[in-house]
């Protein structure tokens, strides 16, 4: 009995020892394998290759850009970074979700901007042009997505190898396409190995139209657009808008008045504005000792767009002295709105107004029409008061002819939500013979219409053949750029009016003065000024209305805004315009769009007695309180622009008070000048603005939500993007679902065979993992046997 009992003890001890050994081995091997999988996930994330979408072909360097290499990139690659972040989704995007690039750095941090976009050799552009941009994981890929990422990497690698093979060797059963005519020479001259072109690429190249005749006036080309963006990024002092002293900017006192829509006294904003001018010289008219200005005004954060008459003593530079005569078209007109235009005096002292009548009844699609009306005024001189007596002859002058200019019906037939409609901003000008014209913003008609075919118009590109080829493949390889290019057809149009001054109609319709097919869908607020024997045409534009995502995203990232004024010059009013400064750039943004000193809607006014200078007026673009609660859109300080005889321009360091429309000896006020220094007394930024991210949902629209409100406004979304130390932020700054495990693994687990959490399990198919599972299973069986034996012994004892 004793020997038998000892034998059982020895046998039991051996089983227990074997069980413990196997269990320990399984646990150690499982843990090390899981840890290896986790490390592997980190390595995949850190070394993930970032595919580059090229927009230029000037650089012959063939290196691939990886996430690791990006640390060595210069600021010239800034557009590439923006495009990689946003365009890689390769989906059709709207204005809301494409404007997502933010700036957290001062403008002065921009150092090297030799190019707007990352440049790639022609052969690399060609080989990648027909592929969708990658959706591969970047450094923020979650560890539990590693299997999917690796699977995709494997597929991408296989596809890349197949594409490489197919680009070199034609398919056995397919006929190799051939380049034809002029495009063949261009491709070969650009250094592309034609044997590596796919049939699809060759077919796309063969569609290119090399016609050299412009169909719709002078063209703003794709190359011009890139140059304008590059100039903005570089902050060239000849074109950068001067800095204003942010502490001196204030809301317009005269903007507190009866609102046209509500009929109540409201604190209104004011934006697009224009003086009553002599239609021939462009000088501000002197109406009975007063200067008159018409401006768009409305309640913040409301779709409220109407025009008001403002007045001040002629030559008075004091911003506080402006008064408001009220809305020109009266009260209670929410459906019919009035947008920008121009105005001149009639011989009887009445104002002939040209404006944009906007019908919003069709689902707020803003049906725009050029209109005219005669405005009669009352003057109570002893009370220093001007009022609107009555308005006559209010009628539609022009809303497109379908051929030169797109009509509303044409637009509505094809609009899918990505197409802008434009028939607005009529500017009046008389030629030397007394003929009257309107220059206006529009879209091209069937003469040179929007559509896919514009992508194949070589004339739209405007660079060297090599540059154009790279841009061509850039457009084809990016779905958002391609879609924008298809719809882009902005134009600056011109019509001649008949001799009925107070009730004008169209006498002749001309081809556009400027057009931007494939390049931009919005060039607005045209302004023509005659200086000496030349006509100078200016217009404002937002680059994010253009097709080249890489370019405008680069400006957003570098400066924080993408607005500009472009300019052209001609010996003739109705045709023959050439761009100023080679690309057309005249003014570029210099501060982020949500700073108190950001501006837009630039309007050039002649300086009396000078044929080489213009006074540039604009408004502070704080619509919807984007710069902070209570900071409204208001008139900006004006500044001088020098016009040089060689068709170049230079911004001068001459600045006025806010709302100065007449430059004279008393106009200059150096106190309004600012600097780009964070803590300077005359800084261009208010406290808290330096480094503040730009929320592009708030910029450039007509229904804007408040930005960082102190007190919530009823019925208006109040989600500040970067709250200033909130007690209870509406949007948590930490993720709702933490990236760390909710139940952390204990430092000293009591149960040595506790199941590993799912996020740390090894990958399926791993040999070590399989061995660990087998060992774990064996140990579990032996453990069960051992525990059973123990239980039996306890019961027997």
Curated annotation (Swiss-Prot):
<feature type="binding site">
    <location>
        <begin position="424"/>
        <end position="425"/>
    </location>
    <ligand>
        <name>substrate</name>
    </ligand>
</feature>
<feature type="binding site">
    <location>
        <position position="542"/>
    </location>
    <ligand>
        <name>substrate</name>
    </ligand>
</feature>
<dbReference type="GO" id="GO:0047725">
    <property type="term" value="F:inulosucrase activity"/>
</dbReference>
<feature type="binding site">
    <location>
        <begin position="522"/>
        <end position="524"/>
    </location>
    <ligand>
        <name>substrate</name>
    </ligand>
</feature>
<feature type="region of interest" description="Disordered">
    <location>
        <begin position="708"/>
        <end position="766"/>
    </location>
</feature>
<feature type="binding site">
    <location>
        <position position="317"/>
    </location>
    <ligand>
        <name>Ca(2+) 1</name>
    </ligand>
</feature>
<feature type="active site" description="Proton donor/acceptor">
    <location>
        <position position="524"/>
    </location>
</feature>
<feature type="compositionally biased region" description="Basic and acidic residues">
    <location>
        <begin position="82"/>
        <end position="95"/>
    </location>
</feature>
<feature type="binding site">
    <location>
        <position position="662"/>
    </location>
    <ligand>
        <name>Ca(2+) 1</name>
    </ligand>
</feature>
<feature type="site" description="Transition state stabilizer">
    <location>
        <position position="425"/>
    </location>
</feature>
<keyword id="KW-0808">Transferase</keyword>
<comment type="function">
    <text>Fructosyltransferase that catalyzes the polymerization of the fructose moiety of sucrose to produce inulin polymer and inulin oligosaccharides such as 1-kestose and nystose.</text>
</comment>
<feature type="binding site">
    <location>
        <position position="419"/>
    </location>
    <ligand>
        <name>Ca(2+) 2</name>
    </ligand>
</feature>
<dbReference type="InterPro" id="IPR003469">
    <property type="entry name" value="Glyco_hydro_68"/>
</dbReference>
<keyword id="KW-0479">Metal-binding</keyword>
<keyword id="KW-0134">Cell wall</keyword>
<dbReference type="Pfam" id="PF00746">
    <property type="entry name" value="Gram_pos_anchor"/>
</dbReference>
<feature type="signal peptide">
    <location>
        <begin position="1"/>
        <end position="36"/>
    </location>
</feature>
<dbReference type="GO" id="GO:0050053">
    <property type="term" value="F:levansucrase activity"/>
</dbReference>
<feature type="short sequence motif" description="LPXTG sorting signal">
    <location>
        <begin position="761"/>
        <end position="765"/>
    </location>
</feature>
<keyword id="KW-0964">Secreted</keyword>
<dbReference type="GO" id="GO:0005576">
    <property type="term" value="C:extracellular region"/>
</dbReference>
<comment type="similarity">
    <text>Belongs to the glycosyl hydrolase 68 family.</text>
</comment>
<feature type="binding site">
    <location>
        <position position="450"/>
    </location>
    <ligand>
        <name>Ca(2+) 2</name>
    </ligand>
</feature>
<feature type="modified residue" description="Pentaglycyl murein peptidoglycan amidated alanine">
    <location>
        <position position="764"/>
    </location>
</feature>
<dbReference type="GO" id="GO:0046872">
    <property type="term" value="F:metal ion binding"/>
</dbReference>
<feature type="compositionally biased region" description="Low complexity">
    <location>
        <begin position="130"/>
        <end position="139"/>
    </location>
</feature>
<keyword id="KW-0106">Calcium</keyword>
<feature type="compositionally biased region" description="Low complexity">
    <location>
        <begin position="718"/>
        <end position="740"/>
    </location>
</feature>
<feature type="binding site">
    <location>
        <position position="521"/>
    </location>
    <ligand>
        <name>Ca(2+) 2</name>
    </ligand>
</feature>
<feature type="binding site">
    <location>
        <position position="667"/>
    </location>
    <ligand>
        <name>Ca(2+) 1</name>
    </ligand>
</feature>
<feature type="compositionally biased region" description="Polar residues">
    <location>
        <begin position="54"/>
        <end position="64"/>
    </location>
</feature>
<dbReference type="Pfam" id="PF02435">
    <property type="entry name" value="Glyco_hydro_68"/>
</dbReference>
<dbReference type="InterPro" id="IPR019931">
    <property type="entry name" value="LPXTG_anchor"/>
</dbReference>
<feature type="binding site">
    <location>
        <position position="271"/>
    </location>
    <ligand>
        <name>substrate</name>
    </ligand>
</feature>
<dbReference type="GO" id="GO:0009758">
    <property type="term" value="P:carbohydrate utilization"/>
</dbReference>
<feature type="propeptide" description="Removed by sortase">
    <location>
        <begin position="765"/>
        <end position="797"/>
    </location>
</feature>
<dbReference type="InterPro" id="IPR023296">
    <property type="entry name" value="Glyco_hydro_beta-prop_sf"/>
</dbReference>
<feature type="binding site">
    <location>
        <position position="487"/>
    </location>
    <ligand>
        <name>Ca(2+) 2</name>
    </ligand>
</feature>
<feature type="binding site">
    <location>
        <position position="340"/>
    </location>
    <ligand>
        <name>substrate</name>
    </ligand>
</feature>
<feature type="compositionally biased region" description="Basic and acidic residues">
    <location>
        <begin position="65"/>
        <end position="75"/>
    </location>
</feature>
<feature type="binding site">
    <location>
        <position position="660"/>
    </location>
    <ligand>
        <name>Ca(2+) 1</name>
    </ligand>
</feature>
């Amino acid at each position: 009995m004793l020997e038998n009992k000892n034998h059982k003890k020895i046998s039991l001890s051996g089983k227990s020892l074997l069980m413990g050994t196997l269990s320990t081995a399984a646990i150690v091997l499982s843990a090390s394998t899981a840890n290896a999988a986790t490390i592997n996930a980190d390595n995949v994330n850190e070394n993930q290759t970032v595919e580059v979408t090229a927009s230029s072909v000037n650089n012959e360097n063939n290196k691939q850009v990886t996430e690791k290499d990006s640390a060595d990139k210069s600021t010239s690659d800034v557009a590439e970074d923006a495009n990689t972040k946003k365009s890689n989704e390769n989906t059709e995007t709207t204005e809301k979700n494409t404007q997502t690039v933010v700036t957290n750095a001062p403008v002065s941090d921009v150092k090297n901007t030799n190019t707007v976009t990352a440049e790639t050799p022609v052969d690399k552009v060609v080989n990648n042009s027909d592929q969708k941009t990658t959706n591969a994981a970047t450094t923020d890929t979650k560890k539990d997505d590693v299997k999917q990422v690796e699977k995709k990497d494997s597929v991408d690698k296989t596809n890349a190898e197949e594409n490489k093979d197919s680009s070199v060797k034609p398919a056995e059963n397919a006929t190799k396409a051939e380049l034809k005519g002029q495009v063949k020479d261009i491709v070969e001259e650009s250094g592309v190995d034609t044997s590596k072109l796919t049939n699809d690429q060759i077919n796309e190249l063969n569609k290119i139209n090399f016609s050299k005749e412009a169909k719709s006036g002078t063209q703003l080309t794709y190359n011009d657009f890139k140059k304008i963006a590059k100039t903005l990024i570089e902050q060239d002092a000849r074109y950068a808008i001067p800095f204003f002293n942010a502490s001196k900017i204030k809301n317009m006192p005269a903007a507190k008045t009866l609102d046209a829509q509500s009929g109540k006294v409201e604190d209104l904003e004011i934006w697009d504005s224009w003086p009553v001018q002599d239609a021939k010289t462009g000088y501000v008219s002197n109406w009975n000792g007063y200067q008159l200005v018409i401006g768009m005004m409305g309640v913040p954060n409301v779709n409220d767009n109407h025009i008001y008459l403002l007045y001040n003593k002629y030559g008075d530079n004091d911003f506080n002295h402006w008064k408001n005569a009220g809305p020109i078209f009266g009260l209670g007109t929410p459906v019919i709105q009035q947008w920008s235009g121009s105005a001149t005096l009639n011989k009887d002292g009445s104002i002939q107004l040209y404006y944009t009548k906007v019908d919003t009844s069709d689902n707020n699609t803003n049906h725009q029409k050029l209109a005219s009306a005669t405005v009669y005024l009352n003057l109570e001189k002893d009370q220093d008061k001007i009022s609107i007596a009555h308005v006559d002859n209010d009628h539609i002058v022009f809303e497109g002819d379908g051929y030169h200019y797109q009509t509303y019906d044409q637009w509505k037939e094809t609009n899918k939500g990505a197409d802008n409609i434009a028939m607005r901003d009529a500017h009046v000008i008389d030629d030397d013979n007394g003929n009257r014209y309107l220059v206006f913003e529009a879209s091209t008609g069937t003469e040179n219409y929007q559509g896919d075919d514009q992508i194949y118009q070589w004339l739209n590109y405007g660079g060297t053949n090599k540059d154009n080829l790279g841009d061509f493949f850039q457009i084809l390889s990016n779905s958002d750029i391609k879609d924008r290019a298809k719809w882009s057809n902005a134009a600056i149009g011109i019509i001649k009016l008949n001799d009925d001054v107070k009730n004008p109609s169209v006498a002749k319709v001309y081809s556009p003065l400027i057009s931007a097919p494939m390049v931009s869908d919005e060039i607005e607020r045209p302004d023509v000024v005659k200086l000496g024997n030349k006509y100078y045409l200016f217009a404002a534009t937002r680059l994010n209305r253009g097709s080249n995502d890489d370019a405008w995203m680069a400006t957003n990232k570098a400066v924080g805004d993408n607005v500009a004024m472009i300019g052209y010059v001609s010996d003739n009013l109705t045709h023959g315009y050439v761009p100023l400064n080679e690309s057309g750039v005249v003014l570029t943004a210099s501060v982020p769009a949500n700073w108190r000193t950001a501006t837009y809607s630039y309007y050039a006014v002649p300086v009396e007695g000078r044929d080489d200078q213009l006074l540039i007026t604009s408004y502070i673009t704080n619509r919807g309180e984007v710069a902070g609660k209570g900071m409204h859109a208001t008139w900006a300080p004006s500044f001088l622009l020098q016009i040089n005889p060689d068709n170049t321009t230079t911004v001068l360091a001459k600045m006025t008070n806010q709302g100065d429309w007449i430059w004279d000896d008393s106009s200059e006020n150096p106190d309004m000048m600012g600097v780009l220094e964070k803590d300077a007394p005359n800084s261009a930024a208010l406290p808290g603005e330096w480094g503040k991210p730009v929320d592009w949902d708030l910029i450039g629209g007509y229904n804007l939500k408040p930005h960082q409100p102190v007190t919530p406004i009823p019925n208006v979304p109040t989600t500040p993007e970067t709250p200033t130390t909130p007690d209870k932020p509406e949007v948590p700054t930490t993720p709702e679902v933490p990236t760390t495990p909710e139940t952390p693994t204990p430092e000293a687990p009591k149960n040595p065979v506790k199941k590993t959490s799912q996020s740390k399990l090894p990958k399926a198919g791993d040999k070590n993992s399989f061995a660990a599972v087998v060992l774990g299973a064996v140990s579990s069986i032996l453990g069960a046997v051992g525990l059973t034996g123990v239980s039996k012994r306890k019961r027997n004892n």
